[in-house]
């Protein structure tokens, strides 16, 4: 499955669940209840398998993912909506793409320390002697990629995330 069709499917599924927020708003739910429903019922759909595909999505797909939250916040705040950034602050939320990036970083750290998945990452071979002035900054060997598509795949991306910390 290509990431574009996967992202399209997840965004469509999230929009289909937006009726719940509209319905709760019509029934008079409080803002905190509406934000909770948005996060748990609508945006949670977007997190499905995120560490595997988030590194490969395009800028347009990132905008589509953020737009789901934007629509949800617009429904919640109604006429008091004064922009996406202000609505995020009022709802005490982060952009979905920022949450996905954080989720991917946490997944990489946990996978590297796991007995089962640590085999995904090859330890860096010592090329020089560590001295006070020159420390080996990378923890894991970079994954060689002959094509750009493989370079953006999950294992090289997760390795780069761990090495950049």
Q: What do the predicted segments below correspond to?
A:
Residues 1-112:
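Non-catalytic, peripheral interaction segments enriched in hydrophobic/basic residues
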Residues 47-62, 66, 75-78, 82, ...:
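Charged boundary/loop elements
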